[in-house]
Amino acid sequence: MARLDLDLAHSYKANPQSDEDYALLPLKMCFDDGGAYALLGPSGCGKTTLLNIISGLIRPSQGSVHFGGTEVTNKTPQARNIAQVFQFPVIYDTMTVAENLAFPLRNRGVAPAQIKQRVGQIAEMLELSAQLDSPASGLAADAKQKISLGRGLVRSDVSAVLFDEP
């Protein structure tokens, strides 16, 4: 992960007038390359909003986001090279475990041989190898969350992996 610098605030209102109008009060934060960080706070305090701003799913109403010294505030999620693992597993029930893990790589045009190798590595790491040919629809919630995690980890070009209450 490249160094991440945040100097932002976010409101869903056009002209916030008070602290209560903000989903995220003005903040400045720095996350160094290679670190592991946790955002702690009560429900509704803005943790998910901040993760969505970092990943590019939401644009902050004020301020900027920088990766490795480059401003990415207006860049798409794809251009940011971020993987996000959401609280509720994001998988395709109509696909097998292997197809779910391969999905991000196929969408980026990775060669089939590389996809097979990388899917195998991730499946082994997450103890999903025995289930690769199983339909995702029949799996328990914890296995579905592992698949969601695997989809975040399968790409070797990811700058950061964000976990939202996985």
Region locations from a protein language model:
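Conserved ABC ATPase signature
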Residues: 135-139, 143
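Conserved ABC transporter NBD signature motif
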Residues: 63-71
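Conserved ABC ATPase "signature" region
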Residues: 71-73, 106, 113-131, 162
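A short, flexible loop at the N-terminus of ABC-type nucleotide-binding domains that lies
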Residues: 1-33, 74-76, 109
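The feature captures the beta-strand-to-loop junction immediately N-terminal to the Walker
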Residues: 40-42
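ABC ATPase nucleotide-binding domain "signature" region
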Residues: 38, 84, 147-153
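Short coil-to-helix segment of the ABC ATPase nucleotide-binding domain corresponding to the Q-loop/switch region
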Residues: 95-104, 135
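Helix-to-loop junction immediately C-terminal to a conserved catalytic motif
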Residues: 55
